[in-house]
Amino acid sequence: MVLIVDNYDSFVFNVAQILEEAGAAYCVRKNDDHSILDGGFDCAIISPGPSVPDESGLLMRFVEKFSGGKLLGICLGHQAICEFFGAKLRRITPAHGAQSELTDIDFSDPLWRGVSDFRVGRYHSWSVERQTLPPRLRVLALADGEIMAVRLSGTKTYGLQFHPESFLTPAGGQMLRNWLDL
């Protein structure tokens, strides 16, 4: 069972659709629903959202409890994972509905298996400050100099600043299936 932590963002339904197409059982719970802290799931996806991690319900408590397990943070979820481990966020010129090409990709990571199109959709106005990223978080890809993907070393915990569930990320479904298959 995949738990989707909904940060009050409509893109959560795009994530759910990809999971459904992949044949994965899932449930969706809001970020302020205390049941997200109870466990009872195999893995979790933290959805995008309109805020910052500290202002998003129980999100940081959730990351504290379940990081190191099989966890995928998308946009706000990515920022929460990075911030929990010590990185700082900074406001950037908004990239809402922008498509970028991933660069500096760590092709050794299984997240990219079978992916040949590295265009990604971006919808964010905050970014992780690269110089504050702790060594435990390995950068897997950049775009326009911004961190787009990280992995917590030795775990199945990932953060994606871009939106794999967006139509602007043609290979996003493959990326999510690769994560599910870990």
Predicted regions and their residues:
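Catalytic beta-strand/loop cores that center a nucleophilic Ser/Cys/Thr
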Residues: 109-154
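Histidine-centered divalent metal-coordination motifs
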Residues: 75, 124, 163
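C-terminal and late-domain segments of enzyme folds
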Residues: 136-151, 156-182
